[in-house]
Curated annotation (Swiss-Prot):
InterPro entries: SAM-dependent_MTases_sf (IPR029063). CDD domains: AdoMet_MTases (cd02440). It comes from the Eukaryota. Residues 1-53 are annotated as: Disordered. The lineage of its organism: Eukaryota, Fungi, Dikarya, Ascomycota, Pezizomycotina. One of its GO terms (biological process) is methylation. Coiled coil: none annotated. One of its GO terms (molecular function) is methyltransferase activity. Disruption phenotype: Does not alter the amount of produced r-N-DMAT. Methyltransferase; part of the DMATS1 gene cluster that mediates the biosynthesis of a reversely N-prenylated monomeric L-tryptophan (r-N-DMAT). Seems not to contribute to the final DMATS1 product. This is Methyltransferase FFUJ_09178. Its EC number is 2.1.1.-.
Length: 351
């Protein structure tokens, strides 16, 4: 008889982040704060953010370099569009805080049991989510997988990291996890249905899957993001490059999460759509804080985010630098009110 996941009779997280305070749903327009006279640019949070990412070692990994930045490469082909060096790791740690704020401080929206036993964080990046989750649930074994060894070596005793390509067959035994966490895998997955099928396979009966994704399209509710702006060009750049890379950047726009999760066999499917401001223009204090980190994430290492896709499109280094300068200037201009759409889908494996 297969082991079942612990019952979630006393869930740790709310069904809706709104129960914790103001978070902009996808249907709500973001209310703009008054702009003080003469204050058009916002300095954000500065350059003080520090991140410690000591590498683990593995002889099977190789890296390629584009304009001095390193990218994961498997057999000579880059497997991930974002840089895997320290600058980008710092940006991804900022993104973790930004994404957590977007869920009212929650690490998950699935109603997990207090005595959850084993969790898998797929595509864990710097490992920061897995570490925070392990701290929150000290009795739970947390495994984070990624193709690059950029996780810290000093971690809670109940967390470990493994080198694994989630686009290949997963090596974990069937029905071995209570919860599978999938976050910000946009541009990395050639077959989303297969990804959710793999998650279904390794989950215990009654276990939960959760998929959090962000749109690449930068929008505004008041048309402050102009069609010819660098902000408006951001999404189309990634979408055009995806035709060469082979992995979609329109996960949210094409609604790939919920149908794929349902097709895999999950039940009790829930979905949460929201907006993430990319500078501190909102009037609401919590949304303004989200916007501060949105700006910091977007400008901390813009090069590491866009360089690979720009290189795929044949841009020269000079063209990349000009675009990045324009993008950063527009993000910091408080007259612009940019945001991206977020979607979280969570569901349960039948018992």
């Amino acid at each position: 008889m297969s082991q079942k996941s612990p019952k979630s009779g006393s869930p740790r997280s709310p069904r809706s982040p709104q129960s914790q305070g103001p978070v902009a749903t996808a249907a709500q327009a973001l209310e703009v704060d008054d702009l003080p006279e003469g204050e058009e640019d916002d300095p954000g949070l500065g350059e003080d953010f520090e991140s410690s990412t000591a590498s683990i070692t593995s002889s099977i990994l190789h890296y390629r370099t584009i304009n001095g930045r390193t990218y994961h490469s498997e057999r000579g082909n880059a497997a991930y569009w974002g840089s895997n060096d320290e600058r980008q790791s710092e940006a991804m740690d900022i993104a973790h805080h930004m994404f957590t704020l977007s869920q009212s401080g929650e690490l998950h929206l699935a109603p997990l049991s207090d005595n959850i036993q084993k969790v898998l964080d797929v595509g864990c990046g710097t490992g920061i989510w897995a570490i925070d989750f392990a701290d929150k649930y000290p009795g739970c074994e947390v495994i984070g997988t990624d193709i690059s060894p950029i996780q810290p070596s000093w971690v809670p005793p109940n967390v470990k990291f493994e080198i694994e390509d989630f686009n290949q067959d997963w090596t974990f035994p069937p029905e071995s996890f209570d919860y599978v966490h999938l976050r910000y895998l946009v541009g990395c997955v050639p077959n989303w249905d297969n990804l959710f099928e793999q998650a279904f396979k390794v989950l215990k009966p009654g276990g939960w899957v959760e998929s959090f994704e962000a749109s690449a399209i930068i929008e505004s509710d008041d048309d402050s993001v102009k069609p010819d702006s660098a902000l408006a060009q951001w999404g189309p750049i990634f979408i055009k490059a995806s035709k060469t890379i082979g992995n979609t950047f329109t996960v949210v726009g094409d609604n790939l999460q919920r149908p794929g999760i349902e097709k895999a066999g999950f039940i009790d499917v829930e979905q949460w759509d929201s907006k993430l401001p990319l500078n501190p223009f909102p009037k609401d204090p919590k949304l303004k804080e989200m916007g501060q980190f949105g700006e910091l994430f977007s400008t901390r290492d813009t090069e590491g985010l866009v360089l690979f896709v720009a290189n795929t499109l044949g841009w020269t280094p000079e063209e990349v630098h000009v675009y990045i300068a324009k993008f950063r200037r527009e993000i910091r201009d408080r007259r612009n009110h940019p945001y991206i759409r977020l979607r979280t889908v969570w569901a349960r494996k039948p018992e």
